[in-house]
């Protein structure tokens, strides 16, 4: 693996693309199917590498970046619940120094001096399944899983079977009008052993680890199965709350205990970062003796007013972070090396391992990243290797045990042709990835692009899963996205080879439901439409930025056509969008430069797809900053630059890094420099920090 410091921009872009696809796949396996293929440590390693590359190359941050989304979509079979407030994930740190860096980031954001002590709360990070339980006037009403952070699965009846969950809030004083309690459902080690023994006695497959057992038990369509499993829970946070004011997170946890919620007794208030670090080491020493699995410690800023000021980044709060415990290792044999082909043609090698347990998780696969990584470590089929999982990172091969290498082993030869279509696998100068040159003739790419198109964050067509896409593509029924919307018409043709309703696994009702689901998705918001196209480096966050900037499909399409010339005003405007940059801009232009892509877009519109204009957050609608382009320059006195940008974005503004005639406001602090000068030359509105604070709500 090439160190981040040695990556070229092109290599970094390719690596981020690979990581986004790999992490998304493992999110689905973990959150939807409760069947992870890698350890938490291996997953964390992938996320960590992604974040390190993004920090080094901020202009390459993708919309589908793991730093911009949480979890995976709710599975079929469960009703969907939209969270009143998103259930976000957490960033990670792995060392004492990184914990201190977290503390310093908090200080910089809040503009605190070195004498001010930050109060924290340290909570054990339970390895279970997150939930949100809603109470109205003290009565339990609904519960949901995290899902993708915005929408989860309705587990109201299932969670009610847990004896740890209060059905009604009792105790001293009034109860809130609305209280969403968030926490983790888990299975103790003793209950896990007992459950697996029952599974074995019944001739059923045992669970791989307590986390899978807890998730699988809670996510049952029959609540009685959940009731039969011994599940526990700890409460640790709030969602939507009405009618309750607390000054600190610790005070909130104490209030939860008075209402009957279990709160982890290992939770500890800490004064300053050194106290946090000491608490982490103390808990690490107790880890093995605990009767439940933990994989780290969660650090939270205690003061609620500071939490509100700190706010959130795209997928996580700024005021909390997860400290992951060190990597756990094991040794196993490489049975095979498989090459996977992604939707953009990237060939990714994967080591197929003799299954081995690492830190309580059965691992059967490990990513080998790319051709250079295999060569550097000289990984061969038949080798005995050491693998590790560190925190939430995906399993990785650490080293080859050369003294145990078979005498007849041979170096792995990376293919120069696509294993799916036979086209050349080309490696461009300066890149680490080989890519299939087959394009649309490569069924692997075509199928993966179609799967992406119907995925939950794109068109979200329920009932049209990956296996169905593969079948319909192989039969020629769906070769491009527009074909999806013609599927019912094709099925009704008199000459159809086999009507969907008469196929194995289908029936009149399921066929009708699919056609209804397809029709219902003919109307789609602009940001989801852009994301669905599968443009390189354009994930959800980037798609939302583009949609917010151009507002309508017609305006975006026109701008992309005009941006075909790099020196054009349209191209300059595109790469000036916050977080876009030249690399993403070039990929967007390249997409529209291909005739077959433009034809595919036209075919979608001709098929009746209606792309809705971008809708800004309702709260931002009345803000004087809504829809305005804002540039910050100079040093601010009462808030950090990051806090100011976050405030502007939350109020519907577009924040860019350079001043142009299209800029609405330039907010200046001390030592503003050339940007202020240019703004005044252009006759733009220049705001002081005080004026910006007044405009943004004080």
UniProtKB/Swiss-Prot annotation:
The active site is at residue 125. GO terms for molecular function: DNA ligase (NAD+) activity; metal ion binding. It comes from the Bacteria. CDD domains: BRCT_DNA_ligase_like, LIGANc. SUPFAM superfamilies: BRCT domain (SSF52113), DNA ligase/mRNA capping enzyme, catalytic domain (SSF56091), Nucleic acid-binding proteins (SSF50249), RuvA domain 2-like (SSF47781). Its EC number is 6.5.1.2. Keywords: DNA damage, DNA repair, DNA replication, Ligase, Magnesium, Manganese, Metal-binding, NAD, Zinc. InterPro entries: BRCT_dom, BRCT_dom_sf, DisA/LigA_HHH, DNA_ligase, DNA_ligase_CS, DNAligase_adenylation, DNAligase_N, NA-bd_OB-fold. GO terms for cellular component: cytosol. PANTHER family: CHROMOSOME TRANSMISSION FIDELITY FACTOR 18 (PTHR23389), DNA LIGASE (PTHR23389:SF9). Belongs to the NAD-dependent DNA ligase family. LigA subfamily. This is DNA ligase. It comes from Rhodospirillum rubrum (strain ATCC 11170 / ATH 1.1.1 / DSM 467 / LMG 4362 / NCIMB 8255 / S1). The lineage of its organism: Bacteria, Pseudomonadati, Pseudomonadota, Alphaproteobacteria, Rhodospirillales.
């Amino acid at each position: 693996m090439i160190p981040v410091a040695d990556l070229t921009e092109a290599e970094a872009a390719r690596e981020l693309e690979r990581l986004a696809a790999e992490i998304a796949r493992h999110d689905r396996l973990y959150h939807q199917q409760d069947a992870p293929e890698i350890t938490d440590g291996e997953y964390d390693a992938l996320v960590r590498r992604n974040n390190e590359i993004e920090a080094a190359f901020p202009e390459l941050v993708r919309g589908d970046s793991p730093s911009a989304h949480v979890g995976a979509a709710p599975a079929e079979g469960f009703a969907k619940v939209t969270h009143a407030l998103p259930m976000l994930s957490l960033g990670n740190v792995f060392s004492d120094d990184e914990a201190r860096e977290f503390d310093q980031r908090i200080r910089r954001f809040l503009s605190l001096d070195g004498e001010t002590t930050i109060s924290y709360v340290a909570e054990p990070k339970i390895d279970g399944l997150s939930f949100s339980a809603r109470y109205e006037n003290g009565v339990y009403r609904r519960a949901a899983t995290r899902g993708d952070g915005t929408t989860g699965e309705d587990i109201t009846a299932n969670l009610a079977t847990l004896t740890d969950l209060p059905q009604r809030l009792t105790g001293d004083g009034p109860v809130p009008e609305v209280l969403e309690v968030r926490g983790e459902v888990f299975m103790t080690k003793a209950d896990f052993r007992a459950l697996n023994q029952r599974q074995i006695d019944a001739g059923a497959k045992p669970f791989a680890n307590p986390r899978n057992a807890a998730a699988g038990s809670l996510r049952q369509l029959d609540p009685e199965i959940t009731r039969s499993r011994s599940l526990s829970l700890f409460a640790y946070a709030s969602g939507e709350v009405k009618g309750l004011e607390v000054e600190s997170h610790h005070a909130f946890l104490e209030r939860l205990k008075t209402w009957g919620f279990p709160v982890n007794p290992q939770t500890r208030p800490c004064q300053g970062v050194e106290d946090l670090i000491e608490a982490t080491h103390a808990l690490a020493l107790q880890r093995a003796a605990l009767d439940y699995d933990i994989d780290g410690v969660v650090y939270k800023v205690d003061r609620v007013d500071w939490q509100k000021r700190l706010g959130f980044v795209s997928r996580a709060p700024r005021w909390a972070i997860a400290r992951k415990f060190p990597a756990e290792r094991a040794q196993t044999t490489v049975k095979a090396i498989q090459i996977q082909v992604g939707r953009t043609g990237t060939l990714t090698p994967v080591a197929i391992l003799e299954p081995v347990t690492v830190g309580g998780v059965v691992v059967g696969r490990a990513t080998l990243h790319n051709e250079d990584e295999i060569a550097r470590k000289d990984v061969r089929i038949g080798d005995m290797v050491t693998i590790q999982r560190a925190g939430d990172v995906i399993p990785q091969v650490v080293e080859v045990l050369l003294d145990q290498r078979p005498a007849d082993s041979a170096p792995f030869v990376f293919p120069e042709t696509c294993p799916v279509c036979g086209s050349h696998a080309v490696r461009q100068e300066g890149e680490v990835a080989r890519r299939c040159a087959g394009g649309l003739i490569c069924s692997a790419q075509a199928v993966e692009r179609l799967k992406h198109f119907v995925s939950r964050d794109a068109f979200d067509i329920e009932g049209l899963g990956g296996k169905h896409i593969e079948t319909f593509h192989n039969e020629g029924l769906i070769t491009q996205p527009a074909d999806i919307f013609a599927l019912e018409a094709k099925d009704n043709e008199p000459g159809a080879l086999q009507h969907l309703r008469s196929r194995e696994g289908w029936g009149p009702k399921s066929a009708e439901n699919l056609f209804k689901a397809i029709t219902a998705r003919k109307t789609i918001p602009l940001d989801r439409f852009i994301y669905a196209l599968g443009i390189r480096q354009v994930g959800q966050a980037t798609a939302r930025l583009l949609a917010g900037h151009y507002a309508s499909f017609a305006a975006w399409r026109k701008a992309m056509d005009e941006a075909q010339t790099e020196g054009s005003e349209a191209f300059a405007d595109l790469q000036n969008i916050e977080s876009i940059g030249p690399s993403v801009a070039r990929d967007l232009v390249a997409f529209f430069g291909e005739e077959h892509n433009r034809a595919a877009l036209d075919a979608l519109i001709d098929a009746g797809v209606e792309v809705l204009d971008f809708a800004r957050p309702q709260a931002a609608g009345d803000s004087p900053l809504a829809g305005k382009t804002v540039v910050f320059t100079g040093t601010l006195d009462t808030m950090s630059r990051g806090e100011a940008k976050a405030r502007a974005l939350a109020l519907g503004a577009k924040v860019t890094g350079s001043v142009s005639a299209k800029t609405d406001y330039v907010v200046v602090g001390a030592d503003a420099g050339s940007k202020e000068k240019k703004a005044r030359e252009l006759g733009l509105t220049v705001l002081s920090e005080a004026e910006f604070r007044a405009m943004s709500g004080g």
